[in-house]
Curated annotation (Swiss-Prot):
Disulfide bonds join C102-C113, C130-C216, C195-C208. Residues 53-229 are extracellular. The lineage of its organism: Eukaryota, Metazoa, Chordata, Craniata, Vertebrata. The modification Phosphotyrosine is found at Y7. Keywords: Disulfide bond, Glycoprotein, Lectin, Membrane, Phosphoprotein, Receptor, Signal-anchor, Transmembrane, Transmembrane helix. GO terms for cellular component: cell surface; plasma membrane. It is a single-pass type II membrane protein. Hematopoietic cells, megakaryocytes and platelets. This is C-type lectin domain family 1 member B. The gene is Clec1b. Residues 1-31 are cytoplasmic. InterPro entries: C-type_lectin-like, C-type_lectin-like/link_sf, C-type_Lectin_Domain_Fam1, CTDL_fold, NKR-like_CTLD. GO terms for biological process: cell surface receptor signaling pathway; platelet formation; signal transduction. Coiled coil: none annotated. Acts as a receptor for the platelet-aggregating snake venom protein rhodocytin. Rhodocytin binding leads to tyrosine phosphorylation and this promotes the binding of spleen tyrosine kinase (Syk) and initiation of downstream tyrosine phosphorylation events and activation of PLC-gamma-2.
Length: 229
């Protein structure tokens, strides 16, 4: 517009300020986003905690299951061996029960199966024969094992005890040394008597070239619980 002096006057009207409602809306969304973030983090933490608890519980239950299985197996073993023992007393002969994990003609005692073989062999030949049966010559390091074996034999039997020479220690087939305060050898331990046999409940040294019957031993495995009855 032109004024009285001929100058042009600009009539500029101030622009209306933008609605301030956008700013509160933006703040509201930020608050909501923060709430959702915190909630999500809480959910993740909760899920992780549940996962840890679940894994811990699974490990506990697995350990309990293993303990119960071991206890059941021990009870089953004792019961099975008692069934066999009572049957042998009753029949006065070797008895095989279907609960035994041992092969036919092998006897079940403790954690082992014992094979009594009537083969006249040298000690080395006996050792090899047992190896072929996936076994070793018997170890009678405990009195209970010695008594069990002695009650079931009448003839001389090679066992898994030997030494390299008269200056060396007597050792079992598993490389353990014969304990001085444990089972003792009876008779003379002269030179060239570097292998041992069992007879009449006692262990005797002998020449390894002698020929005798033998006893093999191998791990029994698990008692057949489902065959107890």
């Amino acid at each position: 517009m032109q004024d009285e002096d001929g100058y042009i006057t600009l009539n500029i009207k101030p622009r209306k300020q933008a609605l301030s409602s956008a700013e509160p809306a933006s703040s509201w969304w930020r608050v909501m986003a923060l709430v959702l973030l915190i909630s999500s983090m809480g959910l993740v933490v909760g899920l992780v905690a549940l996962g840890i608890m679940s894994v811990t519980q699974q490990k506990y239950l697995l350990a309990e299951k293993e303990n119960l299985s071991a206890t059941l197996q021990q009870l089953a073993k004792k019961f099975c061996q008692e069934l066999i023992r009572q049957s042998e007393i009753k029949t006065k002969s070797t008895f095989e029960h279907k609960c035994s994990p041992c092969a036919t003609k092998w006897r079940y005692h403790g954690d082992s199966c014992y094979g009594f073989f009537r083969r006249n062999l040298t000690w080395e030949e006996s050792k090899q024969y047992c190896t072929e049966q996936n076994a070793t010559l018997v170890k009678t390091a405990s009195q209970s094992t010695l008594d069990y074996i002695a009650e079931r034999i009448t003839s001389v039997r090679w066992i898994g005890l030997s030494r390299q020479n008269s200056k060396k220690d007597w050792m079992w087939e598993d490389s353990s040394v014969l304990r001085k305060n444990g089972i003792n050898l009876s008779g003379n331990t002269e030179e060239n008597m570097n292998c041992a046999y069992l007879h009449n409940g006692k262990i005797h040294p002998a020449s390894c070239k002698e020929r005798h019957y033998l006893i093999c031993e191998r791990n029994a495995g698990m008692t057949r619980v489902d065959q107890l009855l």
